[in-house]
């Protein structure tokens, strides 16, 4: 990675864990995002994401270690967070459907990689939305799913992290739990909360079971039931 080619235009975010810059490639004249993360990330996750892009995921352009920090260059994505969007006005049921189908698609994509990638921090703040198109971002605590490996650290966001994540375990069902919590949140932020809850309650209930073995065993199983209950309804 030739970091000197990326001119730092603005600091977008600063914390103890990371800095995020809006940068410009001085030769290609394109704008990107540069993340400086103050620990060593699993670069094999970024290798998988770079080699297997998806329309609802920011493209990974480059990555490297530098002085015990991880540097990630990603595609710049326009838009606001889903968290901000739902604070502005209620969602129409068709918007809820569109958001969820896009989310199912990208989560299914990362879960089907070899090995699967577990996001571990799916929440409205980590989803950008622009003109109805969503982008799942922030893979900093994501991991490759290796069945016999225990997580080194407990991670995730309170309210969205599955119970097993607090015990140092995470798998595909952990992401399904977070998707279920997110579904519940955007249903409550919709124009027609009560009728939507009546058809989606069982999906939310199943996906957010404390016992991970009682959740959907794949995100596509959850998507299939969502479509059966939600699709072709007139709102």
Summary of predicted features, one role per range:
Residues 111-129:
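Catalytic-loop of the protein kinase fold
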Residues 67-81:
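Conserved short submotifs of the Hanks-type protein kinase catalytic core
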Residues 10-43, 47:
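ATP-binding glycine-rich loop module of kinase domains
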Residues 82-91:
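AlphaC helix of the protein kinase catalytic domain
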Residues 150-164:
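Conserved activation segment of eukaryotic-like protein kinases, specifically the C-terminal portion
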Residues 99-100:
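Activation segment signature within eukaryotic-like protein kinase domains
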Residues 175:
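Conserved catalytic-loop aspartate of Hanks-type protein kinases
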Residues 53-62:
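Conserved HxN/HPN-centered segment at the entrance to the catalytic loop
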């Amino acid at each position: 990675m030739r970091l000197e080619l990326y001119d730092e235009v603005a600091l977008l975010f600063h914390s103890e864990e990371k800095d995020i810059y809006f940068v410009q490639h001085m030769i290609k004249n394109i704008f990107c995002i540069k993340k400086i993360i103050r620990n060593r990330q699993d670069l094999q996750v970024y290798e998988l994401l770079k080699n297997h892009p998806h329309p609802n995921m920011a493209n990974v352009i480059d990555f490297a270690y530098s002085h015990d920090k991880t540097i990630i260059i990603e595609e710049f994505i326009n838009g606001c967070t889903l968290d901000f969007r739902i604070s502005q006005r209620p969602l129409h049921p068709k918007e809820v459907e569109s958001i969820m189908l896009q989310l199912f698609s990208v989560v299914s994509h990362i879960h089907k990689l070899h090995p699967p990638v577990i996001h571990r921090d799916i929440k409205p703040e980590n989803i950008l939305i622009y003109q109805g198109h969503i982008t799942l971002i922030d893979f900093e605590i994501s991991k490759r799913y290796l069945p016999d490996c225990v997580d080194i650290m407990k991670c995730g966001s309170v309210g969205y992290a599955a119970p097993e994540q607090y015990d140092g375990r995470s798998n595909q069902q952990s992401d399904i739990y977070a998707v279920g919590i997110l579904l519940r949140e955007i249903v409550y932020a919709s124009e027609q909360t009560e009728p939507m809850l009546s058809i989606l309650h069982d999906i939310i209930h199943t996906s957010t079971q404390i016992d991970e073995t009682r959740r959907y065993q794949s995100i596509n199983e959850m998507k299939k039931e969502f479509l059966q209950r939600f699709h072709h309804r007139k709102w």
